[in-house]
Amino acid sequence: MSEGKVDEFMAITGADDAAIATQFIEMADGNLNTAISLFFENGGAALLSSNNTPTPSNSTPMAPTSVDSDADAQLAERLQREAYQQQQPDQDYVRPPDEARHEVLTETSGFPISYGGIGGRFEPLHRVNDMFDEGRPESIFNQRLDDTNTNTYINDNSSDSLDSEEENDDDEYEYVEEPVIELDEDGNIKEYTKLVRKPKTISKEQKLALLFRPPFSIMSKLDLDAAKQKARAKQKWIMINIQDSGIFQCQALNRDLWSSRPVKTIIKENFVFLQYQYESRNAQPYLQFYHLNNKDDLPHIAILDPITGERVKQWNRVVPIPEQFISEINEFLASFSLDPKVPNPTVNEPLPKVDPTTLTEEQQMELAIKESLNNNSSKSNQEEVPSTGEEQKRVQEPDPFSTIEARVHPEPPNKPGITTRIQIRTGDGSRLVRRFNALEDTVRTIYEVIKTEMDGFADSRFTLNDHQREDLIDKLNMTIADAGLKNSSLLLEKLDPEIE
């Protein structure tokens, strides 16, 4: 143990016993700050005051201090005993109140460190990885920043230039020394090596990772509130992209749109760009405030006013073509301004759907009654208008069955591919099997044959259904082939006169 630590300990604490200083430093494993904290937390201040005051005559003399190799517990016990001995002469002794202290809480996002006291260490309140979905393992489709940056505070240091784009080139290319042989002006052979830029030999997995890499070079590593402050300071809009790594369209957005250099350029010049995963911590305030409650709306891109927080433009469920996206951005920048003196166009956003689970019981009842009344009124309006037209049609159009006449149709000879056999069964078990010309005979022909060849149906009303229980009265003018009745079995049912 260095004597410098002992001297520094005694100078800070005011202790005049080097043995005590040595003991506390050993207890703290050589950590001077921890040793000083232990000294004051375990009665060191009382020990100093007792050494500076005269000892009463009737008190027990203080035992000489000795250093014991394993005296941690003994030291604490001795300090406690000595404190009690100082209080014995005056039974009415009252400990003075703790000294008042005034301290200032430091803004945790201002410096990239963690903090903590003895026996504990606390992580920062906001981390860069709060942008990502930590509930899913890191993979090609769920990429994050390098491990060296994941536990730091949210502190955006991104520049407004695209110089950082070279990092992508570094991932794809490398410089290799190659020998070069040349002839100088005198005809002598000159041999040397030079660095040659060549594509790296990378695996298929690495190629996919580069292909679907998020746009880290333009992403601001901030939460939404900090991004608004930065955007106001730099007179820029906020562009936010909400993704879900399980939706391929979100991956296609990284691959096709955010990888475009012209898109990155226009974003860097005019926007503070944020990209959050749907389940991430940073995305939750946006999802709740702007009512993005359905993953079916992903990928979601929006432009926010950093002053008012208004969402002035958005894209949902699409992967814009880079050229079209740039055109829309230019139109937006031409129409909207961050100058408070310049009026902006009115934005009519669709009303968000109310989530019933977030309402109270009374609000849920009111919502249900309101929707029920709206549905009933809309249905009644829809039914009232066409009902008059339908009644007029029924008056004007004759009954299809009344147009069917009893006509004799001779059975055609068998012609493969042209004729077909159809079985007509009744409810009492009787049946009629007959050939028809599938290409020329219509469904009406079947009805006319029934009226002429089956007993009891000439003057009766009946229904004729196919094997799917579909009434064929609506297919009277269709050919047998078009109606799908080749080699079919039809069910014939006579209706009661009362039903007619």
Curated annotation (Swiss-Prot):
Phosphoserine sites (modified residues): 139
UniProtKB keywords: Cytoplasm, Nucleus, Phosphoprotein, Ubl conjugation pathway
UniProt biased composition (Low complexity): 50-61, 148-161
Family annotation (SUPFAM superfamilies): Thioredoxin-like (SSF52833), UBA-like (SSF46934), Ubiquitin-like (SSF54236)
Residue span, UBX domain: 415-493
Pfam families per UniProt: Thioredoxin_7, UBA_4, UBX
Record bears the keyword Cytoplasm: yes
An annotated GO BP: proteasome-mediated ubiquitin-dependent protein catabolic process
One MF term in the entry's GO annotations: ubiquitin binding
Described function: Involved in CDC48-dependent protein degradation through the ubiquitin/proteasome pathway.
Further comment found in the protein's record: Present with 6630 molecules/cell in log phase SD medium.
Protein name (database record): UBX domain-containing protein 5
Organism: Saccharomyces cerevisiae (strain ATCC 204508 / S288c) (Baker's yeast)
Gene name, Swiss-Prot/TrEMBL: UBX5
